[in-house]
Amino acid sequence: MGIQGLAKLIADVAPSAIRENDIKSYFGRKVAIDASMSIYQFLIAVRQGGDVLQNEEGETTSHLMGMFYRTIRMMENGIKPVYVFDGKPPQLKSGELAKRSERRAEAEKQLQQAQAAGAETEVEKFTKRLVKVTKQHNDECKHLLSLMGIPYLDAPSEAEASCAALVKAGKVYAAATEDMDCLTFGSPVLMRHLTASEAKKLPIQEFHLSRILQELGLNQEQFVDLCILLGSDYCESIRGIGPKRAVDLIQKHKSIEEIVRRLDPNKYPVPENWLHKEAQQLFLEPEVLDPESVELKWSEPNEEELVRFMCGEKQFSEERIRSGVRRLSKSRQGSTQGRLDDFFKVTGSLSSAKRKEPEPKGAAKKKQRLGPAGKFKRGK
């Protein structure tokens, strides 16, 4: 889910923090991609007649087709992707995961009713609601990436948090995901729609955290409190407080604790056993991989092993897979050229002079808890 309504709120109150770019403008950029979010998109979008792609054994293959061709598209445009996979979800997320299970059970019932009624549109809608990324999907995509020569990382916990850590450490330019909580985890730059279908023709949206904080007049701790008020995966929000009201309250009172102290408890009851402090800590001190231990390497694809896996096991067209490998190899030759801004330091201009970012305080300054360095798999 991410943060409820955050993208629209930023567009309304801090529009200068959002840029829209064509994929070609990211030539030479390294980008950390939320793997689970991408795989979920592929399972939803890569379909034939409303159904996921399958081989003769009935195994789903939509995720592999999506991962193969979208990754090639990025490489052809000079982007160097590194996929980051989720680790163990934090305990705070258990409530949200339970709600998702309930929604899946309800969608299953509605799907059966739609099938009985022969309502094709409804059948497709509820079928997509039942899509879930499994360990097998993840493992197969990791195997595919290793054969393609594309690096991936296993995060100790939430992938978005480790993506944010890689951006903050300068290992990559941006984090790519549809989940806005990547900003709440502190990613300086967030890209949306990078792995979306070409058919949708969506421009890539680029969100800049420093500009968001400047426009709202908040520091990172206060921004985290705003996101908790909007609604996150980790704790309930206060009913009756909408996005604009949440912004007004945090700008005026500076913290959730002060807001709660001043709110009318009858009009705005605080959730029972509210875990907002735990959510604050999770956002400000997430368990992440150690960026300094990460060495990213993009290598030549293993054509014969790719054919064996994608064609022999998963029954894709050999001609198409070999064609894709040729495109991938060609893109590697072109992407060795760097960006001009990697060689020349920008000293500033009148139009883009940055104001000083509000200084974080307290817990925001504490070093993030580092999980295991993240099992790093290098493309062979």
Curated annotation (Swiss-Prot):
It is an enzyme of class 3 (hydrolase). The modification Phosphoserine is found at residues 187, 197, 255, 293, 335. One of its GO terms (cellular component) is mitochondrion. The keyword Transferase does not apply. DNA binds at residues 47, 70, 158, 231, 233. The modification Symmetric dimethylarginine is found at residues 19, 100, 104, 192. InterPro entries: 5-3_exonuclease_C_sf (IPR036279), Flap_endonuc (IPR023426), HhH2 (IPR008918), PIN-like_dom_sf (IPR029060), XPG-I_dom (IPR006086), XPG/Rad2 (IPR006084), XPG_CS (IPR019974), XPG_DNA_repair_N (IPR006085). Its cofactor is Mg(2+). It comes from the Eukaryota. The modification N6-acetyllysine is found at residues 80, 354, 375, 377, 380. Residues 122-253 are annotated as: I-domain. It is found in: Nucleus, Nucleolus; Nucleus, Nucleoplasm; Mitochondrion. SUPFAM superfamilies: 5' to 3' exonuclease, C-terminal subdomain, PIN domain-like. Residues 336-344 are annotated as: Interaction with PCNA. Its EC number is 3.1.-.-. Residues 363-380 have a biased composition (Basic residues). The modification Phosphothreonine is found at residue 336. This is Flap endonuclease 1. It comes from Ovis aries. The gene is FEN1.
